Amino acid sequence: MAKDKKFVEDITPMDEDFAQWYTDIVKKAELADYSSIKGCMIIRPNGYAIWENIQKYVDTKLKEYGHENVSMPIFIPENLLQKEKDHVEGFAPEVAWVTHGGDDELAERLCVRPTSETLFCEHYAKIVQSYKDLPKLYNQWCSVVRWEKTTRPFLRTTEFLWQEGHTIHETKEEAESHSLKILNMYSRLCEDMLAMPVVMGKKTEKEKFAGADDTYTIESLMHDGKALQAGTSHYLGQNFSKAFAIQFSDRNGKLEYPHYTTWAVTTRLIGAIIMVHGDDSGLKLPPRIAPTQAVIIPVAQHKEGVLEKAKELKEKLAKVVRVKLDDSDKMPGWKYSEYEMKGIPLRIEIGPKDIEKNQAVLVRRDNREKTIVSLDEIEIKVQEMLDTIHNSMLEEARKARDEKTYVATTMEEFEDIIENKPGFIKAMWCGDRACEDKIREVTGATSRCMPFEQEVVSDTCVCCGKKAKNLIYWGRAY
């Protein structure tokens, strides 16, 4: 047996250094690597395969809803970006500019797209004339560039992958309904695929997307008590339509401006998976999003019949799950640690004694429970166990979030919680931006959302003591 040249390295305990724990998992689980360009990353096959599964879910849903995929240019002329004032002001600090083509200075600077509203609007203005042309439901899978000052793989990078949807509608009601429909789909993605519970709600005026009338969001809570914005959907009203002169003849022959929505999820969802589910042994992947759902590890594979049986088992299971057989010459113990670190949801062990008894041993990654199953029932048992693992991981994440969700009715309580018990803080707000600004200045917490499911935890604003208007989820965030 060849000597193993690579051994599973220890991962920094999350309680010791959460940021280093996260970085260790990204690198050791081979999800991504650093690029020579500051703030950019190389998404490795293990990481990209997770993104592909996210893509598959979202793309299927969007097509069910009637969306079509398109591809817009990566460059935006400066004059086009300037057309919507609030929008350009919101993105100006993060824009990367192209000033030369070869040795020649360009007559006009080109922006490397930070987002594509301006390109879609320019196109829609050319192709929409009548209400019969509406709605237009377009989506794009691409990368965008935002020149971030502080970066971390998946969570905040200079270039990242996303999907961006851009739709225009005949009426405000239709556009708002569509925006919320997409948000609900994102929520289902997180809970049904990523086993990650979210809070759905609306952003405050201060936190909404630049140029939007309303921004809706799904917010999740990480192991360290910080919030992460997992996806957003924006109702842009007629702001962009007017700025770009997109008009259509309505049912009475009158010229009107369509109502616009835009929405996105990004590769930061991979970072969320790490920080919601991971532990000190490494990555812990929810089964439905895992590129490999089960790994077969033959025990004493040099003995007669073991490898043959393992291959037969793989062939059988490949019809129902995404399965891998590791028949390398590394020791079984090394393989156990390796696949535990990489987060494979289910390990299947089979050796000579198992073959004699017509059985295999299933080991769950989420809680390390072992179950012996008959080979005659293994296809259905593996599928059932993967569903059980998903439900267990979702429930565990929901329990962890709820245990770190607190209520504050005064600033003293708020400050004590944020410093000593990081998590979501539910607190009432008067609606005054000055209070929102003060809370951020004093505590570093931002308003994450006004949840759709409102409750009253106090009659007064947590900051100023005046009559409260809304419950807000607050927290420090990525």
From Swiss-Prot:
Belongs to the class-II aminoacyl-tRNA synthetase family. ProS type 3 subfamily. The keyword Protein biosynthesis applies. One of its GO terms (biological process) is prolyl-tRNA aminoacylation. One of its GO terms (molecular function) is ATP binding. This is Proline--tRNA ligase. Consists of three domains: the N-terminal catalytic domain, the anticodon-binding domain and the C-terminal extension. Homodimer. The gene is proS. Keywords: Aminoacyl-tRNA synthetase, ATP-binding, Cytoplasm, Ligase, Nucleotide-binding, Protein biosynthesis. The keyword ATP-binding applies. One of its GO terms (cellular component) is cytoplasm. Catalyzes the attachment of proline to tRNA(Pro) in a two-step reaction: proline is first activated by ATP to form Pro-AMP and then transferred to the acceptor end of tRNA(Pro). It is found in: Cytoplasm. It comes from the Bacteria. Its EC number is 6.1.1.15. CDD domains: ProRS_anticodon_zinc, ProRS_core_arch_euk. It catalyses: tRNA(Pro) + L-proline + ATP = L-prolyl-tRNA(Pro) + AMP + diphosphate. InterPro entries: aa-tRNA-synt_IIb, aa-tRNA-synth_II, aa-tRNA-synth_II/BPL/LPL, Anticodon-bd, Anticodon-bd_dom_sf, Pro-tRNA-ligase_IIa, Pro-tRNA-ligase_IIa_arc-type, Pro-tRNA_ligase_II_C.
